[in-house]
UniProtKB/Swiss-Prot annotation:
Changing T118A: No change in SPS layer formation. Induction: Expression is regulated by the sporulation-specific transcription factors GerE, SpoVIF and GerR. This is Spore crust protein CgeA. Glycosylated. SPS is anchored at Thr-112, which constitutes a probable O-glycosylation site. It is found in: Spore. It comes from Bacillus subtilis (strain 168).
Length: 133
């Protein structure tokens, strides 16, 4: 995203939140302005952080689970072991939201009526991935 788009995003968020901060003073100090300034700084920082997420940082081999899921073809059958030791699968890989770090998988429901269940997994909680041929 370009810097103009990032600035527009910041300005829009601030404009939506501005009615929450009418000018008022308490003890001679404008408390709402101080709070608004802190919120503005937090918005700027968060938007700037989201702008620094690039393809290079998402595909960085030092982040192995992200690296793996960024390269899996949708429709691939896999099993996932989480950092808590839970095994998920076999499941069918659907998609990977690289910005938010969410893995989407589906599996046939074992309850009636028959259907599919979609599971969303935090990529940072994945310990290993097994591929089936």
């Amino acid at each position: 995203m370009s810097s103009e788009n990032a600035q527009l995003k910041k300005d829009l968020i601030k404009a939506v939140l501005s009615p929450l901060f009418p000018t008022a003073t308490e003890g001679g100090e404008n408390m709402d302005s101080n709070l608004k300034a802190l919120l503005d700084a937090a918005i700027d920082q968060k938007v700037d952080e989201s702008e620094t997420v690039t393809a290079e940082s998402i595909l960085d081999p030092s982040l192995p689970a992200r690296w793996i899921f960024a390269r899996i073809t949708p429709g691939t059958t896999i099993s996932i072991v989480t950092d808590s030791g839970d095994m998920i699968g076999p499941v069918v890989f659907v998609a990977f939201d690289q910005v938010h770090g969410i893995v989407f998988v589906t599996q046939e429901s074992s309850v009636t009526p028959a259907g599919q269940a979609t599971t969303l997994i935090d990529v940072d909680k994945v310990e290993s991935v097994t591929f089936f041929s």
